[in-house]
Amino acid sequence: MNILPIMEKFFTIQGEGSHTGKAAYFIRIAGCDVGCVWCDVKESWERHEHQETEISELIESAKASKCNFVVITGGEPAMYDLTLLIDGLKAEGIYCAIETSGCYPLKGSIDWYCFSPKKFKLPCEEAYTKADELKIIINHPSDFAWAEEHAKKVKEDCALFLQAEWSKNEKILPQIIDYVKSNPRWRISLQTHKYMQIP
């Protein structure tokens, strides 16, 4: 696939997960059929509302940022064959990460696989073996048990993160803090970009 539907691309700071605080060039691919009710980028769901962009243009824009770390996100980016995009970025010496629900097998050899499963659509089995990072959004206290079910299936060295659903942050974050203190293999992911008021 030489073109992809792109909602936006921008240079910022990665705000969450293992790479928090790093300068990062984001490529947000449009299109998602997972349907998280609390999604903060619902405008990314409809691919046909966004411009089809040449992969070569995406690679050039990432190069122009002079950032050697690209995050491919969505939407659900794994809906598409990302081989040409990932290979093209890596050929330029750019480290590539993806943020995915794991609902689709990934086409492309990614450097960092952030797996954030959702209850609305079950992930495929390969997501558990590929995951470098498991990030669970905590929306309700019952989600802690759900997080543990997924943690049992990932690799032993997979980084484990719990992140509060943003609209419930004040209520949920204290519960996450207590949980991580009692279960220290988990770490807290804060959406620090929202505190910094950056994209």
Stretches found by the model and what they are:
Residues 4-7, 11, 23-24, 30, ...:
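Conserved Radical SAM active-site core
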Residues 13-17:
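A short beta-strand-turn-helix
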Residues 19, 48-50, 150, 193:
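Histidine (H) residue identity feature
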Residues 19-21, 128:
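A generic structural micro-feature
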Residues 78-199:
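Conserved AdoMet/S-adenosylmethionine-binding subsite of the radical SAM
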